[in-house]
Amino acid sequence: MALSFKNSSGSIKAKRIKDGLVNANDIETTVIDFSYEKPDLSSVDGFSLKSLLSSDGWHIVVAYQCVTNSEQLNNNKKNNKTQKFRLFTFDIIVIPGLKPNKSKNVVSYNRFMALCIGMICYHKKWKVFNWTRKSYEDNTSTIDFNEDEDFMNKLAMSAGFSKEHKYHWFYSTGFEYTFDIFPAEVIAMSLFRWSHRVELKIKYTHESDLVEPMVRQLTKKGTISDVMDIIGKSTIAKRYEEIVKDRSSTGIGTKYNDVLDEFKEIIKKINSSSLDSTIKDCLKDIEE
């Protein structure tokens, strides 16, 4: 049975779908000029992060590589390139601007990154939320893998999350789509991005833009107040404390203040006769 995948530019057609999987050979993973075709059952969403993470044959190294090279992958997305990655025994096909569809392995870029985040956090032994029991529990991953020292999340590093920080691999594009398994973490990280938006130089039109992706995932589970109660506000607060703990403030504002403090100490050591009018004017506001 043929299947069309709708994205912002039109649609991409695959020859067949079997057991929810599309064969990567049926879709050319390169830049494509899309022509519009009416998608089949585009309103049906077959994506399930939890289901994919229960798949066999993990290629965890690919997840680490993708987050490490996320800047290049994001540029490919911006250039409208379709990409494929062997995360499991089957390929994950990434189509820019993809709309929900009934395939579980043809996904948008943000959902793909969420899948990489989920795999890495499973590997790091993060607890997973059970919506039926309304509590966190151990994940079932038993994969044994030692990550390469060259692997790192550059975006997280720029936000002050060192490689040793628990949230180093979580702070990445698409983290909101891990809500099904890490709801408290997603809410807490969204709160962190909002409260540190100036330091992180996050571009936005309205403050609501900073939490909108999280809210979209949250409301799939129920009303905001009900879902917050299910997860537990105290649990969310603890996750926020984990996020800000031991984080290096790398924002330019903090660096600026640090430099000014150093300047003040240097000024004290300079002979007053060497402080010409120009430097005095520059340092006047600092001294005040």
From Swiss-Prot:
Q: Tell me where in this chain the PTM N-acetylalanine is found.
A: A2
Compartments reported by the entry: Virion
Q: Which UniProt keywords apply?
A: Acetylation, Capsid protein, Virion
- Quote the cellular component terms of the Gene Ontology held in the record: viral capsid
Protein family according to the UniProt entry: Belongs to the high plain virus capsid family.
This chain's protein is named Capsid protein
